[in-house]
Amino acid sequence: MYRDFIIFALGILTSFMLIIIFGEIHDRYGNTPSNREKRKYIEDRIKEVHDALKIAFAEMKYTSRDSITDNYCEYAKLQLEWLNSEDVMCHGNVEDVMRLRRDCLDLFASNKNRSLRSVVLEDIDDITWETNRLSSTYDYKIKFYTKAYKIYISWLNSNDLLCESTSERELYKAKLEKAILHLQSIR
């Protein structure tokens, strides 16, 4: 009788422990969004940021107050940091991400009275420098930057405003192609 009670008590304790353990596992891993939900969130946020940047361009065109333009530039800087996040690189559409990146860079250029050309070329320099330090453990970054570099090359080919001369265009295209080869060799 006493042994049956101990077995019964151990069975109840084991049941409670399993319920608690499975509850913790579900809380930790069960509430993470799926890849589809992450993609949807990123698409929605990109649309919201595009809308905010349109408003920023319109306001900057009609006002010269430094506080407003500085706030919009700070906002664009935060969005550029978000565009470099792991979730965006893994689940975001590269074309949409790069279009938003270009809009943010355009906002910086107009705020700092610099040409879009100098800001984009500076961004290319920064990104190629960053990817030269990548290792094979960052597979999502390698895939993202490979596609992003191809988009940068198409920008250079399609927009005469980004480069002052053909030699400068070819120099940056060669730099990007070298970076693509470097990323492919890491894989």
Predicted regions and their residues:
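Repeat-associated, polar segments at repeat-unit boundaries in modular proteins
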Residues: Q79-L121, N159-R187
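Feature marks short, highly hydrophobic, charge-poor N-terminal signal-anchor/signal peptide-like helices
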Residues: M1-L10
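Short amphipathic alpha-helical heptad-repeat segments
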Residues: Y41-A52, I68-Q79, N93, L116-I124, ...
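Charged, low-complexity interaction regions
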Residues: F57-D70, D87-E95, R133-K143, D160-R169
